């Protein structure tokens, strides 16, 4: 997973994350310096996911082109915001 921030925070590249997609539900989990982070959401249609992480006041979107191995989107969490890109296995 690659994460880019709007602030001067350096980007995270190649970070490990777990992706589970089951029907129209999606769960993304990863670890950071504060512990495990879990975003859960649903496919709103055609690979457009809306996710939340209530513990971090996080909201996110992820989008997937049908033949792509990537999920890409925007996130907001505890006042920070940026973009992320996840490579599917």
Protein language model annotation of sequence segments:
Residues 1-89:
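Central antiparallel beta-sheet cores of small beta-barrel/beta-sandwich binding domains
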């Amino acid at each position: 997973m690659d994460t880019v921030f709007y602030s001067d925070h350096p980007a995270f590249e190649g970070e490990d994350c777990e992706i589970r997609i089951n029907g129209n539900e999606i769960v993304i989990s990863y670890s950071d310096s504060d512990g495990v982070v879990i975003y859960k959401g649903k496919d709103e249609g055609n690979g457009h996911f809306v996710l939340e992480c209530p513990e971090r006041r996080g909201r996110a979107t992820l989008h997937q082109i049908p033949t792509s191995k990537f999920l890409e989107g925007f996130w907001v969490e505890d006042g920070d915001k940026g973009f992320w890109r996840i490579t599917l296995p």
